[in-house]
Amino acid sequence: MRFVLSLVSALTILTFARLTLAETVQIEFTDQDSYSIEVAKIDVGDTVVWLPTNKGHNVEFLAGPKLNTLSRKSEIDAFHSVVFKHPGVYLYQCTPHGNMGMLGLIIVGEDFHNLESIKKIELSRVSASVLKRLIRIAQSRTNSL
C-alpha cells in the first residue's frame, strides 16, 4: 500500500512540475511580411503567443492535429495565444499575406506524424516554396537533437 501511495505521490509531483514548467514562445509579426520565428519547436502544454508588432497581419491555421480544438483564425492586428495540447505539426499563415509566403510551423512534442498531409496542402507557388524550406529547417533541428 505504501508503494502505491508513493507512486501516486510521485506521479502527482511530476505532473504538477510539468504544468509549472510549460513555456511560452512569443512570435512577432515583422515589417517584412514574415513571422519573427518561422519554425517553433515546443512541448505539449506550451503556449505560443503572436504579438501584433506590425499592422496588417494575423494567424490562420491551415493544418494540424485536432484543429477543431483551436481558434482557427485571429483578427487582423490582434494579440493571439494558443496552448498546444496535441502533438504534431501545425501550419499557419497570415490571411492577407499567405500567398506571398507568410507561413509558420509549430512542431509540438517532436512529433511529425501528420507531416505528409501538410506537404499535400495546395498553396501558391511562393508559399509552397516557403513551406519546403520550413520543413527542411524543422527536420534538420530534429535530426540534430
Where are these regions (language model features)?
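Positively charged n-region of N-terminal signal peptides that target proteins for export
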Residues: M1-L5
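Extracytoplasmic copper-binding redox domains, predominantly the cupredoxin/blue-copper superfamily
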Residues: L19-L145
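Bacterial N-terminal signal peptides
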Residues: S6-T15
